[in-house]
């Protein structure tokens, strides 16, 4: 085995271990924020939605700058610094008794993510060969699902005692992850050329095809982020116990572990990436619209199952499509900018979703936020269809199996 192949092979295992620590640290804390501050402390969903949206917007909206800096200085210092900032954000969240302190803790958490997320994604693009990326992204997503349910179970158990324990555990996991990267991550460069930060940003902004794709995904993410805000609140309201939230993540883990990789393998040779993305989004949209009308936990979990299946179809295609469009001369910048759709969609989905949820409750129209999200989903589908129509994609979006 050549040294390059050996480095790629070892890199895969490093990425998998690193990803598991990050996912555990995140899901110990974040699924329980809405339960803690809305249900236990009686805050308005809008206040918590602003906090979650702020974290999302800071992490993903500034990601292009984090990626560009990583292109210039390498992945390791950015990743280690970002994970320590995330740990500081979680520690601050544990003592948050006013909205401004929760917002500040989410800002710190998002700033940390801005630094570590783009270089981590760029390392995947650097180390995994193009033909293997779709499957590797599927493996990472399966791991995300397993880590999510383990983290949510641990967080739910700790929440019985004290929310500060929840936050301390999340902070400790990110400190451990920072140490793991500081010790074992080589000083790899992300891009094929060591260009100034400004040049990397310029390459991305000049790539209209990539910019259009990223911005179109804003609507997709407005639906996707509800697994952190409105879905846990709905499960808690209907089941009458925050412990039921862990079953939502258990469902996701079971579906992902059994279906994600087989669906990705089967579909990658039969359908174009953009068609898989649109099919998944359609399933997500159709499953979300009736949620406000359900009256039993069983009905709610059936719709949540369907929503997760749509996500399983869409996510590997979305990641692979974005990675395939990145210019190797500015990988970090591209991966950072690719998060802008998540930044906008997350901010709008959290703050707008929280406001719609409160409004629906006040007007006794619980279906309002879900119907509006369904409308957003259909608008996004139309935008994706327009972008990837045969005439516009003749110059070559990615073919199946590319």
From Swiss-Prot:
Origin species: Enterobacter sp. (strain 638)
Keyword Cell membrane: yes
Coiled-coil annotated spans: none
Membrane topology according to the record: Multi-pass membrane protein
Residue spans crossing the bilayer: 13-33, 34-54, 99-116, 139-159, 165-185, 214-234, 243-263, 277-297, 300-320, 340-360, 368-388
Origin superkingdom: Bacteria
Subcellular location: Cell inner membrane
SUPFAM superfamilies for the chain: MFS general substrate transporter
The keyword Cell membrane is assigned to this record: yes
PROSITE patterns in the cross-refs: MFS
Family: Belongs to the major facilitator superfamily. DHA1 family. MdtH (TC 2.A.1.2.21) subfamily.
One Pfam family in the UniProt entry: MFS_1
GO terms of molecular function: transmembrane transporter activity
InterPro entries: MFS, MFS_dom, MFS_trans_sf, MFS_Transporters, Multidrug-R_MdtH
Protein known as: Multidrug resistance protein MdtH
Predominant place of localization: membrane
Keyword terms of this UniProt record: Cell inner membrane, Cell membrane, Membrane, Transmembrane, Transmembrane helix, Transport
Any one GO CC term of the record: plasma membrane
């Amino acid at each position: 085995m050549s040294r390059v192949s050996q480095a790629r092979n070892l890199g895969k295992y490093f990425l998998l271990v690193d990803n598991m620590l990050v996912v555990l640290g995140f899901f110990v804390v974040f699924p329980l924020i809405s339960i803690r501050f809305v249900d236990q402390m009686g805050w308005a969903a809008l206040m918590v939605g602003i906090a979650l949206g702020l974290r999302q917007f800071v992490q993903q909206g500034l990601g292009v700058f984090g990626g560009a800096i990583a292109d210039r200085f390498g992945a390791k210092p950015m990743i280690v610094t970002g994970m320590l900032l995330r740990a500081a954000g979680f520690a601050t969240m544990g003592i948050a008794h006013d909205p401004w302190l929760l917002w500040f803790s989410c800002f710190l958490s998002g700033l940390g993510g801005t630094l570590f997320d783009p270089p981590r994604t760029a390392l995947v693009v650097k180390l995994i060969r193009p033909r293997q990326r779709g499957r590797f992204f599927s493996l990472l997503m399966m791991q995300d699902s397993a880590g999510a349910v383990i983290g949510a179970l641990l967080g739910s158990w700790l929440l019985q005692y004290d929310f500060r324990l929840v936050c301390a555990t999340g902070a400790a996991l990110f400190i451990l992850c920072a140490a793991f990267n500081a010790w074992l991550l080589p000083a790899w460069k992300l891009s094929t050329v060591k260009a100034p930060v400004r040049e990397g940003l310029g390459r991305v902004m000049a790539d209209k095809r990539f910019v259009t794709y990223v911005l179109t995904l804003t609507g997709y993410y407005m639906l996707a982020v509800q697994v952190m805000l409105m879905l846990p609140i709905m499960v808690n309201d209907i089941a009458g116990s925050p412990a039921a939230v862990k079953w939502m993540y258990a469902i996701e883990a079971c579906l992902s572990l059994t279906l994600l990789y087989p669906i990705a393998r089967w579909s990658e040779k039969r359908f174009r990436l953009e068609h898989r993305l649109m099919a998944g989004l359609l399933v997500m949209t159709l499953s979300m619209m009736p949620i406000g009308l359900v009256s039993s936990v069983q009905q709610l979990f059936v719709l949540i199952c369907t929503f997760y299946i749509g996500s399983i179809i869409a996510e590997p295609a979305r990641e692979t499509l974005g990675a395939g469009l990145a210019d190797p001369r500015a990988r970090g910048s591209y991966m950072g900018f690719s998060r802008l759709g998540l930044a906008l969609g997350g901010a709008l989905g959290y703050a707008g979703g929280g406001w719609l949820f409160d409004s629906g409750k006040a007007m006794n129209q619980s279906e309002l936020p879900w119907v509006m999200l369904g409308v957003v989903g259909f608008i996004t589908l139309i935008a994706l269809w327009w972008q990837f129509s045969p005439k516009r994609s003749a110059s070559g979006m990615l073919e199946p199996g590319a």
